[in-house]
């Protein structure tokens, strides 16, 4: 699935990574690391002054959710007492959704225990490839921990995480609507009401992440999936930055060039305001057919982002033009959303004046595009280049050293929704309530990531309680995490309901056009 700039890698690998890898479907970026080929600081800054001063002021304070969550004591014997022990054999491979340098993503059906018969997406990562690079290990850690920590209607759900001797497995909800990238490629541009719907849902997801102290940093059409109803789901959390609160800044160079905020390119420190720049770049892309600043190569693209004037087509409404100008401000401190109100500032803009935010959060607003699906296993919204391949999870014959396996202690996870059904079946007794704790950032801008074997995965087993020589036998573990009440939406994470045949044909919401995107950003349909 590729469009204007589909990166090599599963669901887009960010532009700063240049690995030769296959395309993968947007919720699961496999290529975790690529060389930082952004050019020198001199290259970034040469050629004149910026149009606006690069003032990277602090972020205003905002409240962090530290809800108390009920915990259950989970052990090897309690979770796997009767029906199952989560492992690859619990899942039947159905289709290949994508693949990259570090593994594959499959559509699978659970064939044992809880959730039997339900359809999921299974992301498989090779340990031997990941442990070669501290940054890749940190990216994997961040993605797994954030997916456990965050539960929101517009963010992909992690159902299980487990491991074998040589592989890591993430079981995620299957998002049969495919990537927003695909819809943009088919349509060319979106009408403003269509773009407004998607941007509104995305803003709610970003706001929730920011409340948790998480900067997303990789917002682009390939990382925005659609569920069976057409609602947004943010995916691919490998580039997220954790524990960014109250004016804290980070310096890591990461993201996709065309959607990257100037302060990231300048490496002068950035905060959550970078996500609002990316939202503005995405909005511009939706309404015009291409990101706001593109060049013949990376150097020229960066130069344009830092110095060129924003050109707005005359057909845009005044509200759209005003929002774009306020989101795409090079001065991060004056950017809309950079203040204490964060997402609230963006959502209060007149462009969103027709949005009922409560109904939107409850997913009661009808999406502009609803995928035509024949069954819950439908893969029509994914690239046939992969879906027609025979799904095979290669034999797990690799062996890591004892010290290398220490990194993956505590990777195992079972979603609270699954544990609740297990709890009822086996009469678990509730333990004391304990506040969720936030773990530190997995990356540092100066020195390589250093691992603490006992607590690398944050919520995992310690070295003193697990046998590092037998990672396949790690017990199921979980911690209390926030539960979103989405019962009003009438929607379950998986399996995805089959669309009713009388729901009508798909109605186009935008005018198709010849793509203005650079060749490397296009998708050949």
UniProtKB/Swiss-Prot annotation:
Domain Protein kinase: 91-352
Broad enzyme group: transferase
Sequence segments annotated as region (Autoinhibitory domain): 424-525
GO-annotated biological processes: apoptotic process; cellular response to growth factor stimulus; long-chain fatty acid import into cell; negative regulation of apoptotic process; negative regulation of insulin receptor signaling pathway; negative regulation of TORC2 signaling; peptidyl-serine phosphorylation; TOR signaling
Main location: cytoplasm
PTM annotation (Phosphoserine): residues: 394, 434, 441, 447, 452
EC number: 2.7.11.1
Subcellular location: Cytoplasm; Synapse, Synaptosome; Mitochondrion outer membrane; Mitochondrion
Keywords: Acetylation, Apoptosis, ATP-binding, Cytoplasm, Kinase, Membrane, Mitochondrion, Mitochondrion outer membrane, Nucleotide-binding, Phosphoprotein, Serine/threonine-protein kinase, Synapse, Synaptosome, Transferase
Subunit description: Interacts with PPP1R9A/neurabin-1. Interacts with RPTOR. Interacts with IRS1. Interacts with EIF3B and EIF3C. Interacts with TRAF4. Interacts with POLDIP3. Interacts (via N-terminus) with IER5.
Protein name as it appears in the record: Ribosomal protein S6 kinase beta-1
């Amino acid at each position: 699935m590729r469009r204007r700039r589909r990166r090599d890698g599963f669901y887009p690998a960010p532009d700063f990574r240049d690995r030769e890898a296959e395309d993968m479907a947007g919720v699961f970026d496999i290529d975790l690391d690529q060389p930082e080929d952004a050019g020198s600081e001199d290259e970034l800054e040469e050629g004149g002054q910026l149009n606006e001063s690069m003032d990277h002021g602090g972020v205003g304070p905002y409240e962090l959710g530290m809800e108390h969550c009920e915990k259950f004591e989970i052990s090897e014997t309690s979770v796997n007492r009767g029906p199952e022990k989560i492992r690859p054999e619990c899942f039947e491979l159905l289709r290949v959704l994508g693949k990259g340098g570090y593994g594959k993503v499959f559509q699978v059906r659970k064939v044992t225990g809880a959730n039997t018969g339900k359809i999921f997406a299974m992301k498989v990562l090779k340990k031997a490839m990941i442990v070669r690079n501290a940054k890749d290990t940190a990216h994997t850690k961040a993605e797994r921990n954030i997916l456990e920590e965050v539960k929101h209607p517009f963010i992909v759900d992690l159902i299980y995480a487990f491991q074998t001797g040589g592989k890591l497995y993430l079981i995620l909800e299957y998002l049969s609507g495919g990537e927003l990238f695909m819809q943009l490629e088919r349509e060319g541009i979106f009408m403003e009401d269509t773009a407004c719907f998607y941007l509104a849902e995305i803003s709610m997801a970003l706001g929730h992440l920011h409340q948790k102290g998480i900067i997303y940093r990789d917002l682009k059409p390939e990382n925005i999936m659609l569920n069976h109803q057409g609602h947004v789901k943010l995916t691919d959390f490998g580039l997220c930055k954790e524990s960014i609160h109250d004016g804290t800044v980070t310096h890591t160079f990461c993201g996709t060039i065309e959607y990257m905020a100037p302060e990231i390119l300048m490496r002068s420190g950035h905060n959550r305001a970078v996500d609002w720049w990316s939202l503005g770049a995405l909005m511009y892309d939706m309404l015009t057919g291409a990101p706001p600043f593109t060049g013949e190569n990376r150097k020229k693209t960066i130069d344009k982002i830092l110095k060129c004037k924003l050109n707005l087509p005359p057909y845009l409404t005044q509200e759209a033009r005003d929002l774009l100008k306020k989101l795409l401000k090079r001065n991060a401190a004056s950017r809309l959303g950079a203040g204490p109100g964060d997402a609230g500032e963006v959502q209060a803009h007149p462009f969103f004046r027709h949005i009922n935010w409560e109904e939107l959060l409850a997913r009661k607003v009808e999406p502009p595009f609803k995928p035509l699906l024949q069954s819950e296993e439908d893969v029509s919204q994914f690239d046939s280049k992969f879906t027609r391949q025979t799904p095979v999870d290669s034999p797990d014959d690799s062996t890591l050293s004892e010290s290398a396996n220490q990194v993956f202690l505590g990777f195992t996870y079972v979603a609270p929704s699954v544990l609740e059904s297990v709890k009822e079946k086996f009469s678990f007794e509730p333990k004391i309530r304990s506040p969720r704790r936030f773990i530190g950032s997995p990356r540092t801008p100066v020195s390589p990531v250093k691992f603490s074997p006992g607590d690398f995965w944050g919520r995992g087993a310690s070295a003193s309680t697990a046998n590092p020589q037998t990672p396949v036998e790690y017990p199921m573990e979980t911690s209390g995490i926030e539960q979103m009440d989405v019962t009003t939406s009438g929607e379950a994470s998986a399996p995805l309901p089959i669309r009713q045949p009388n729901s009508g044909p798909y109605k186009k919401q935008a005018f198709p056009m010849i793509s203005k995107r650079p060749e490397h950003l296009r998708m050949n349909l």
